[in-house]
Amino acid sequence: MALPEFTMRQLLEAGVHFGHQSHRWNPKMADYIFGARNNIHIIDLAQTVPLLHTALQAVSDTVAKGGRILFVGTKRQAQDNVADAAKRCAQYFVNSRWLGGTLTNWKTISASIKRLRHLDEVLSSGEANSYTKKERLTLQRERDKLDRSLGGIKDMGGLPDMIFVIDTNKEDIAIQEAQRLNIPVAAIVDTNCDPKGITYVVPGNDDAGRAISLYCDLIARAAIDGISRAQGELGIDVGASAAPLEEDLPAASASTFQGLPGPRGTADDLKKLTGVSGAIEKKLNDLGIFHFWQLAELNHDTAHQIGEEVGLPSRADAWVAQAKSLADA
């Protein structure tokens, strides 16, 4: 993998250069404005290109070091793109209303996430049958409300190492919280926004659907590049090892996988695997996985099933390759 490439033509075709009406501008964006046409400010893409590249590099570097990226975009035209991009690169997102204190009051947010997990367990198990229809409906509504706000971060396991924001005016509370905690912020900054306090300013249209889709795709690909770099630093060639793993190891289906009732001796530190937080490690332990050798023996289908169980299916194959290397170390 390599850092995603893009051209100025792609930015032009996506409408990245179109700012807001000139009378709605923020003077602090003057340095990034090329001029005005029909009372619409035109963003200087000659500056956007290198600044976007810098932001992509920062995202890749953060993920390569085991960091977590939080995508934030709650406006209607950004919601689907933000969620899809974050899921594609095994990162995290908020695409509904930002709850005040999501970052600065993580302890309370964690309690709400715990409640969401409990409701998921209750509603998906036989325990739900012990409630009346009205009680089940009430629980389902509570669960859906929590999932809208917290579903994208319930597996994050802690504060993010960087946030990527679409529309800094709408997401000003998220940015303020990140600044208070010294969390770097990469953001798309339109001509009506204030770039102050944004670590990685990317001047661009934050309203056009095609532009938002392009930003999210590039950030997701940069995060995937970071994952590949992290694997490379461990000496793992996933592409080369995936086929031999399936041929050499005994086949096991998701339905026949048997976890261990407990660790055999000292459990391995599964957090050494890319993207595995303390919360994900606990999920793996709950499935009876405590050692690298257990993951190393999985075939593709079983690994993917386990990845889905813990909410990170896209990283399952990489875990198998990493686990094989770590088990042999």
Swiss-Prot record:
Keyword Ribosomal protein included in the entry's annotation: yes
UniProt keyword Hydrolase, yes or no: no
One protein family per Pfam: Ribosomal_S2
Keywords, alphabetical: Ribonucleoprotein, Ribosomal protein
Disulfide bridge partners, by residue number: none
CDD domains reported for this sequence: RPS2
GO molecular function: structural constituent of ribosome
GO biological process entries: translation
Gene Ontology CC terms, in alphabetical order: cytosolic small ribosomal subunit
NCBIfam families per record: PRK12311.1, rpsB_bact
Similarity comment text for this entry: Belongs to the universal ribosomal protein uS2 family.
Name the UniProt record assigns to this protein: Small ribosomal subunit protein uS2
Provenance organism: Bradyrhizobium sp. (strain ORS 278)
